[in-house]
Amino acid sequence: MNIFADFDARIKKTLQDIDLKPKDGGELDLSRIGVEPPRDASHGDIATNAAMVLSKAVGQNPRELAARIAEALKADEDVESVDVAGPGFINLRLKASYWQRELLVMLNEGTDFGRSRLGAGKKVNVEYVSANPTGPMHVGHCRGAVVGDVLANLLKFAGYDVVKEYYINDAGAQIDVLARSVMLRYREALGESIGEIPAGLYPGDYLVRVGQELAGEFGTKLLEMPEAEALAIVKDRTIDAMMAMIRADLDALNVHHDVFYSERKLHVDHARAIRNAINDLTLKGHVYKGKLPPPKGQLPEDWEDREQTLFRSTEVGDDIDRPLMKSDGSFTYFAGDVAYFKDKYDRGFNEMIYVLGADHGGYVKRLEAVARAVSDGKAKLTVLLCQLVKLFRNGEPVRMSKRAGEFITLRDVVDEVGRDPVRFMMLYRKNDAPLDFDFAKVTEQSKDNPVFYVQYASARCHSVFRQAADQLGLVDLDRVAMGSHFEKLTDESEIALVRKLAEYPRLIESAAIHQEPHRLAFYLYDLASSFHSQWNRGTENPDLRFIKVNDPDLSLARLGLVQVVSDVLTSGLTIIGADAPTEMR
């Protein structure tokens, strides 16, 4: 249960009970009332700004109104004390019995504690990675892959019906270049000396194997075909090979998509999907024939000094109108974006999230304009931009390229430090802030390494369970037994740990609402820190040890507390896509 939502309802009920009315009549607007943990834990357990946001409407001084509300809240049987602070904040301190009761709820819910119905089954499409199928994934793709994957997991946990999607850019000019590059490697595999890879082609050694496979399958047959026919075969085989490589890289990072959508699908049957999308926009008055003025600065690739078929995107929030067709009659890449969005919308998605690299910042307004025009403003589109990742080793910068045509790949990073450190650390900054990734720091066993610190807390929980088996003979811990004596948890440090656990449902919902999965990584670190501190208190003070052999009821209660910590760590790490270890190796 989200205790903050619970007290939000209690506070609003209290406002009704004291018959609080606007001075000008009508109903009070309660939408701006906030209920959250105080910034300073010493101020209490629950804080609300109710008096400050309502004072003007009711015509009363904020502190006087706060005192009036506070007095009424004291009647709540779960409230120990209520104080008014500052300009009119109301701080509530709750009774230990309330926290003990909530801990029992958490224990009974297990790893489902924190799961929310916020999304109410609403369909959401999260598109992420969508790297061009021209080679292995480099480390720059890594952050978007993790952010998108964890956000999708988070939204699922918050009650949304989520589809994870990858858009395969397999219809552009870069694919023609890729096919020619592989054709060269095919000839090389047949024994031809190809010399230096010509400028403009892909020089990477990863294409050598594709050329060899083609030589093994076709022998010299491709050389005997018309070039266009041969290149079409090479293109298909190469895209399949590149996507197999990309899927393997993503699998190593524990990133999995539900849908791989080929751009070429939009171009079948004379690009029927694109034509239909443009026709729909035309019927809505969003398409016209016109001439764009030359933009200031560097000219974009799709600008031409002629009359063009244009999307009237400035009327739906964009900076300039966008060309839909080129001078040769083919469609612009943007026209494909329109058709792809329409395809998603037609599949029943009213909410779409695009996770893109920071270099795609110029796409945000045009994509938002497409969403408004295609859906008549009914669909919600969000673009999350991921800033660059800089690699370091012991504080020294690491070059991103290894040699000509080669670069540090996602697989290089995962193979060196492991999947879990990569996933966790890619979340340890908000996606729109640059991130430094130090190979040495993410593998050190210290508090300064967040992923180690969190996973170590999980392992410590299980070490407590093993101690319970050794010292108390409790091999199979029973949740009913563990939850039957929570009234014995009275030490302030234990109640403080319960408070931290109680924040989890609110954290899940707020991270989902704001689409900020990094909040989960920060919370897990804070929870781990609280648990490690409690462990250390037991080391310093025998009365606070989790297991008291001479007091089995207290031991069971504390084991129940440890079980909930373990459950929340497991839940959060599962959403992040990392393991919750039972022991550290």
From Swiss-Prot:
Transmembrane segments: none
The UniProt record lists the keyword Protease: no
Family matches, as Pfam families: Arg_tRNA_synt_N, DALR_1, tRNA-synt_1d
Subcellular location: Cytoplasm
InterPro entries for the chain: aa-tRNA-synth_I_CS, Arg-tRNA-ligase, Arg-tRNA-synth_N, Arg-tRNA-synth_N_sf, ArgRS_core, DALR_anticod-bd, Rossmann-like_a/b/a_fold, tRNAsynth_Ia_anticodon-bd
SUPFAM superfamilies in UniProt: Anticodon-binding domain of a subclass of class I aminoacyl-tRNA synthetases (SSF47323), Arginyl-tRNA synthetase (ArgRS), N-terminal 'additional' domain (SSF55190), Nucleotidylyl transferase (SSF52374)
CDD domains hit by this protein: ArgRS_core
A single GO BP: arginyl-tRNA aminoacylation
Gene Ontology cellular component annotations, sorted alphabetically: cytoplasm
EC class (word): ligase
Keywords: Aminoacyl-tRNA synthetase, ATP-binding, Cytoplasm, Ligase, Nucleotide-binding, Protein biosynthesis
Gene3D superfamilies: Arginyl tRNA synthetase N-terminal domain (3.30.1360.70), HUPs (3.40.50.620), Isoleucyl-tRNA Synthetase, Domain 1 (1.10.730.10)
Location, primary (coarse class): cytoplasm
Gene Ontology molecular-function annotations: arginine-tRNA ligase activity; ATP binding
Motif 'HIGH' region location, chain numbering: 131-141
Catalyses which reaction(s): tRNA(Arg) + L-arginine + ATP = L-arginyl-tRNA(Arg) + AMP + diphosphate
EC number: 6.1.1.19
NCBIfam families listed in its UniProt record: argS
Protein family: Belongs to the class-I aminoacyl-tRNA synthetase family.
PANTHER family: ARGININE--TRNA LIGASE, CYTOPLASMIC, ARGINYL-TRNA SYNTHETASE
Subunit annotation: Monomer.
Protein name as catalogued: Arginine--tRNA ligase
Organism of origin: Brucella canis (strain ATCC 23365 / NCTC 10854 / RM-666)
